[in-house]
Amino acid sequence: VHWSAEEKQLITGLWGKVNVAECGAEALARLLIVYPWTQRFFASFGNLSSPTAIIGNPMVRAHGKKVLTSFGEAVKNLDNIKNTFAQLSELHCEKLHVDPENFRLLGDILIIVLAAHFAKDFTPDCQAAWQKLVRAVAHALARKYH
């Protein structure tokens, strides 16, 4: 993936404002609520019976933070996203058997969360840069599936 200087600035500038715990928890909760079939990967998380239960579930919040923290590694390593996610790709493919389409869904949800939290800063140019980033991350995570 080639990044222009402007794209890098838009991504890193917004990332500096992101509350990883809050946005990560919200993104994962939204994934589990909007796409309920993804809940099967989180059976060990306990009560996922309703949107309220999911939003209030401490394991969802903790894993959401973990997911977005690892996403931050992509922001730090824009020029080496494939290698940054090589181990996570292997884990999700070979051990967890996660459908790689779910990575794309989570990326789309992250875009929605960022737009909701940073409406003024989330310009069309910023959205385009972030859309490119979430696609690159989803592709890197799906790499071991090919």
Swiss-Prot record:
Top-level division of the source organism's lineage: Eukaryota
A family per Pfam: Globin
Domain Globin: 2-146
Tissue: Red blood cells.
Annotated Gene Ontology cellular component terms: blood microparticle; haptoglobin-hemoglobin complex; hemoglobin complex
Keywords in alphabetical order: Heme, Iron, Metal-binding, Oxygen transport, Transport
Annotated residues for binding of heme b: 63, 92
Keyword Heme among record annotations: yes
PROSITE patterns in alphabetical order: GLOBIN
GO BP, sorted A to Z: hydrogen peroxide catabolic process
InterPro entries cross-referenced by the UniProt entry: Globin, Globin-like_sf, Globin/Proto, Hemoglobin_b, Hemoglobin_oxygen_transport
MF terms (GO), sorted A to Z: haptoglobin binding; heme binding; metal ion binding; organic acid binding; oxygen binding; oxygen carrier activity; peroxidase activity
Family: Belongs to the globin family.
Protein role: Involved in oxygen transport from the lung to the various peripheral tissues.
Quaternary organization: Heterotetramer of two alpha chains and two beta chains.
Name the record gives this protein: Hemoglobin subunit beta
Lineage of the species this protein comes from: Eukaryota, Metazoa, Chordata, Craniata, Vertebrata
